[in-house]
Amino acid sequence: MILYSLKDVTFGYGNEPVIERLTLDLHAGQLIGITGPNGAAKSTLLKLILGLVKPWSGTVKHCSSPEIKGGVNVSYVPQQVSSFNNGFPSKVIELVRSGCYSRLGLFRRFTKEQEQLVERSLKQVGMWEYRNRKIGELSGGQKQRICIARALAQDPEILILDEPASGMDQGSRLGLYELLRHYVDNHGKTVLMVTHGLEETGVFLDTLITLERKESEGWRCLVTNSCSERFGRED
């Protein structure tokens, strides 16, 4: 089933287009990677899909609505989480619990199931033992992991991640990719992420989208590969 459909999309900054006449369909129930050289507008593509920016021309649609709408069904983890500086007062578990707020009523009463979801999300990213630590005391990679835990605590149908393994060591990166693969296969979710390390991620992906530039044109030439064929992953 097509989840997102982009047709002839052009977008840029100032007077300079960075994406031109891009047409792309993204399918539900897959772990999808987006790759390309530095400056290939990968993060911009995510923002277009999320509806955070509007295309200059063309259309960006969700399969069930005229325009993409966020909310409880979509969680987004941006590339930069360094805004949690050393003085950031909140504890890890407080931030992850905030991922459930959109599903709560006015008085934000947590159910037992929601508390279990918060605990499970922290354990999935290996941060449960840090739950009472202040966020400002954590390393960059640890901050990245708790932001992913917060997104998982929202229990979204669609999880969108911009270079989620940034700042992590190899063991943590591979653990994250295994987690995302499990999230898709066992919970019927869709994950879309920007990635550079294809030697690590390729075996976990269903589909890889490569942004390329044609001479004197913006980033619009797409090469879409089935990763089960390219990297030998069994479906």
Label the model's feature ranges.
Residues 195-196:
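H-loop/switch region of ABC-family ATPase nucleotide-binding domains
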Residues 155:
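Conserved catalytic motifs of ABC-family nucleotide-binding domains
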Residues 159-162:
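Catalytic Walker B motif of ABC-type/P-loop ATPase nucleotide-binding domains
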Residues 134-138:
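Conserved ABC ATPase signature
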Residues 50:
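Helix-to-loop junction immediately C-terminal to a conserved catalytic motif
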Residues 58-72:
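Conserved ABC transporter NBD signature motif
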Residues 97, 112-130:
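Conserved ABC ATPase "signature" region
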